[in-house]
């Protein structure tokens, strides 16, 4: 997958040089009439109809480029082979156990392609567990094999024609993808192309590339430079670009980054020009420019033509024209065309006027009105173009090297400048005296014997040296695949991590792989736990459990507190019982002592009486 840089501005230092279209190497001047003066042919300067009479080796080329809207990805699938197993075990005492298992195996390429072909007959059968076969005192396994296709579009690099994807073990060739598929880092999957469509990305399908015709010619400013021009690309220096292949086709990356193929490549375009192969340069695709050169130049040509027609209208109406009006008759494009020289004539108009305060006194028209109180003759000098001449000249662009706004004769690079010129005078106006100008062809003014001033500049101004401010969609591929070698200049970019579990959408095979990590024996009902309905049930169970747990803790606390109170009462009762027992024991002891004393008394009495009547005493004590 390529990295899209949605906002990338290419800003080059703009250095505009003034370029003037000067008539040189002119032929002889010939007088013409006013109605024979005509405007130069002004076409859209970037159109193919605008000709270069002085261009060398001029011809047309057909160049093409991919459509920006096209995709550089290939249609295909990630193919997986799965065994869905149902295991049923039944014991002799009729206890049944059912287990489900999904086993991932390495798929065969032929089986994957067959599965793709079956898509034309409808969607593939969704995998399912086979019905359980349970028998008494037996363990039965039922399994079904399925090929699972997951639509996935890897990136086809148009420079090396290799297929890149973060899931691939290594970049894959187109031939390998057709014969054995592209192996993934996960060996249980293989990427295969969609055999139902052409094995090429839309980006590289040149059947619907954008093609234009360009004019190829040598630059008038530098014979060692070749230029291409067309309304779509403007004026391009071919030798400032570099050669690069794209989708297996030869082409040129222009200085501004655009890549174009050369459909009818000619040796004249590349001989004697230093066009080298690109080294590490990636092409971009122009999406927007901040100026519409073609439309602007079209409007400019129309306006210049209107100004030229206005100048001719003034000439035909015998109106005064100035050097700016004269400059509109000159072409702004290099080539061969007419250059005009205007010669001035003057005449004096005499009027007889009377002063307002002279009354009925007759005026004298033979005397000057300023020396008479009655009025007199007024003289008015008029200046105008009296004759017109033209010559067939070569119009060549010349750069104002010292950038002083003037063209020096030395800047003409040895080309002959016409020595014909005329002195034009301007009438006094606003209290100022008139001026005398040394004017040559097309209203050019000699401010010094070797220095010219031109009112208008060539349309080449700013076109050859103007660098467009362009927004690109640039394709970079060095950091897409993690296993690729990163060059030193690419370290500033953060590698793109496109691991399946981070970037891709979750599908049912993802949970299958996660299940296999934790254990192979999984009940099918577990999957339902992750559904939205089961989540609500799960949270309800948790809430009820929390309430029951809280209530149980509260009851336990009350029971412990109650038991503590009963134990205190029991201890008090025991203490009372012990004190009563001690008192009873004390009383019993006293009674015993009393009985002992009484017995001792009787013993003593018996001993006293024993001497006289022993038999009677014995009978007493028996009772």
Swiss-Prot record:
Highest rank taxon of the organism: Viruses
Residues in the Virion surface compartment per record: 13-539
Subunit structure: Homotrimer.
Function according to Swiss-Prot or TrEMBL: Attaches the virus to host cellular receptors, inducing endocytosis of the virion. The acidic pH of the endosome induces conformational changes in the glycoprotein trimer which trigger fusion between the virus and the cell membrane.
Protein name as it appears in the record: Glycoprotein
Family: Belongs to the rhabdoviruses glycoprotein family.
Any single Pfam family the record assigns to this protein: Rhabdo_glycop_FD
Organism: Bovine ephemeral fever virus (strain BB7721)
Keywords: Glycoprotein, Host-virus interaction, Membrane, Signal, Transmembrane, Transmembrane helix, Viral attachment to host cell, Viral envelope protein, Virion, Virus entry into host cell
Glycosylation sites (chain numbering): 175, 264, 416, 438, 507
Protein's UniProt keywords contain Ribonucleoprotein: no
């Amino acid at each position: 997958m390529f990295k899209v840089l949605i906002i990338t501005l290419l800003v080059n230092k703009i250095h505009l040089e003034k370029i003037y279209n000067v008539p040189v190497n002119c032929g002889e001047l010939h007088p013409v009439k006013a109605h024979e003066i005509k405007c130069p042919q002004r076409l859209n300067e970037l159109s193919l109809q605008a000709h270069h009479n002085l261009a060398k080796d001029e011809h047309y080329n057909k160049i093409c480029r991919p459509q920006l809207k096209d995709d550089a990805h290939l249609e295909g699938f990630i193919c997986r082979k799965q065994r869905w197993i149902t295991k049923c075990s039944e014991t002799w005492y009729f206890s049944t156990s059912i287990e489900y298992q999904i086993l991932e195996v390495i798929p065969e390429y032929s089986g994957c392609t067959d599965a793709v072909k079956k898509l034309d007959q409808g969607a593939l059968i969704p995998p399912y567990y086979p019905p359980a076969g349970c028998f008494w005192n037996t363990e039965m396994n039922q399994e079904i094999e399925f090929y699972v296709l997951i639509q996935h579009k890897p990136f086809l690099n148009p420079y090396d024609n290799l297929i890149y994807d973060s899931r691939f073990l290594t970049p894959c060739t187109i031939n390998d993808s057709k014969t054995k598929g592209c192996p993934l880092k996960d060996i249980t999957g293989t990427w295969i192309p969609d055999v139902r469509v052409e094995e090429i990305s839309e980006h590289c399908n040149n059947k619907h590339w954008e093609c234009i015709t360009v004019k190829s010619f040598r630059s008038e400013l530098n014979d060692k430079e070749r230029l291409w021009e067309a309304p779509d690309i403007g004026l391009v220096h071919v030798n400032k670009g570099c050669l690069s292949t794209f989708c297996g086709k030869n082409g040129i990356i222009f200085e501004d980054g655009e890549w174009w193929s050369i459909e009818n490549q000619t040796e004249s375009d590349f001989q004697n020009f230093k066009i080298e192969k690109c080294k590490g340069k990636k092409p971009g695709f122009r999406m927007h420019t901040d100026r519409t050169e073609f439309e602007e130049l079209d409007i400019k040509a129309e306006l210049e033509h209107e100004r030229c027609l206005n100048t001719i209208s003034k000439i035909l109406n015998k109106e005064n024209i100035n050097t700016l009006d004269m400059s509109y008759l000159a072409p702004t494009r290099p080539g061969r065309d007419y250059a005009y020289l205007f010669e001035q004539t003057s005449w004096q108009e005499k009027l007889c006027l009377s002063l307002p305060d002279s009354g009925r006194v007759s005026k004298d028209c033979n005397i000057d009105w300023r020396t008479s109180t009655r009025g007199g003759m007024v003289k008015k000098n008029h200046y105008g173009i009296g004759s017109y001449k033209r010559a067939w000249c070569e119009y060549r662009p010349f750069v104002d090297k010292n950038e002083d706004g003037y063209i020096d004769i030395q800047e003409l690079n040895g080309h002959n400048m016409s020595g014909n010129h005329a002195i034009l005078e301007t009438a006094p106006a606003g209290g100022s005296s008139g001026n005398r100008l040394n004017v040559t062809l097309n209203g050019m003014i000699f401010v010094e014997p070797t220095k010219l001033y031109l009112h208008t500049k060539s349309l080449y101004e700013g076109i050859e040296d103007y660098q467009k401010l362009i927004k690109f969609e640039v394709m970079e591929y060095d950091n897409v695949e993690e296993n690729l070698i990163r060059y030193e200049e690419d370290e500033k970019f953060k590698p793109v991590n496109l691991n399946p579990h981070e970037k891709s959408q979750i599908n049912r095979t993802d949970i299958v792989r996660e299940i296999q990590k934790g254990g192979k024996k999984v009940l099918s009902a577990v999957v339902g736990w992750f559904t939205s309905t089961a989540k609500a049930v799960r949270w309800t169970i948790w809430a009820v459990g929390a309430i029951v747990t809280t209530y149980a803790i509260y009851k336990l606390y009350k029971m412990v507190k109650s038991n503590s109170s009963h134990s205190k009462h029991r201890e008090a009762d025991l203490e009372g019982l012990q004190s009563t027992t001690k008192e009873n024991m004390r009383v019993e002891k006293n009674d015993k002592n009393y009985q002992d004393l009484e017995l001792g008394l009787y013993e003593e009495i018996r001993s006293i009486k024993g001497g006289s009547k022993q038999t009677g005493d014995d009978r007493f004590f028996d009772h």
